[in-house]
From Swiss-Prot:
Oligomer status and interactors: The glycine cleavage system is composed of four proteins: P, T, L and H.
Keyword Transmembrane: no
Taxonomic lineage: Bacteria, Pseudomonadati, Pseudomonadota, Gammaproteobacteria, Enterobacterales
Full protein name: Aminomethyltransferase
Name of the gene: gcvT
Species name: Proteus mirabilis (strain HI4320)
GO MF term set: aminomethyltransferase activity; transaminase activity
InterPro entries attached to this UniProt entry: GCS_T, GCS_T_bac, GCST_C, GCV_T_N, GcvT/YgfZ/DmdA, GcvT/YgfZ_C, TrmE/GcvT_dom1
Amino acid sequence: MAKQTPLYDEHVACGARMVDFHGWMMPLHYGSQIDEHHNVRQDAGMFDVSHMTIVDLHGPQVKDFLRYLLANDVAKLTEKGKALYTGMLNASGGVIDDLIVYYFDETFYRLVVNSATREKDLAWITEHAKDYVVDIQVRDDLALIAVQGPHAQEKVQRLLSESHRQIVAAMKPFYGVQLDDLFVATTGYTGEAGYEIAMPKEQAVDYWKKLLAVGVKPAGLGARDTLRLEAGMDLYGQEMDETINPLEANMGWTIAWLPEDRQFIGREALEKLRATGTDKLVGLVMREKGVLRAGSAVHFTDDLGELREGVITSGTFSPTLGFSIALARVPAGIKDSAIVLLRNREIPVEVVKPGFVRSGKALV
């Protein structure tokens, strides 16, 4: 039976259509996915992301452990609360999960991992922690709400005390801070400003209602997906998985190659892949009518006149732009145009860098 977050009854009360999402009953939408999408781009929306897993790691060797476990290097994190995005890889360089890690001090870090990969993530972390003095604490006592949009920060700050408001208002992107019972982070998955806020489960309903009272509207999984795709952000299981390495998923920037003597899981395989070359992830824009969908073939001719083929990993109609966009994995050598096979028709598409909308503004 699918699990419920502490906010399940609130979703139902708001008229949500509930669906099973990787073993969790979650809101797909509250009546109109497109309205929810526009509300996040233009005002402020909130998502229940309590199905995600927060893992706190404590101990004298936790920094060394994470420098081995993750492709990005936590040694970069020297300011309290600073976060980074990284892949957690297998020995062949495939992505076990993508996650965010927060630094509190040399003996305390926090990971936020995906719900779909929870069990394998925890098993992987536990297995590799055996050689280190590390205490693993899964924070199932916490709920998590993401508040996103151009007015999200102002509306959240209305709910804070004056002293906390000053702290939060001064935060840069990709930081987290503990404010009594609330953990407030300047992170998100929409391409908009906002916060991801963790709190004790028993406080989630009250906080949700307070957000509603200051004009933050709920948004479901449907809008979350179109927003992240407009922002050019990867989704685990679509853009990457255990058979896909970061270089093929537009995650090359999350690999810390330096210092050269840092050994992390998957490094040897990645160095070979970097030397031989890999496919790459690109953005596609289709201004004709129709919708680009995952699984569709992408064709182009390379400099040698050879016909090459890739595949769409995620595609949708963009509510902000008014036409279809997609992410696609293709062989290197693609230029600024390609052909997509759509219902037995060859449709021309533009090839762009991943990322179509940021902070409400079109990038294409």
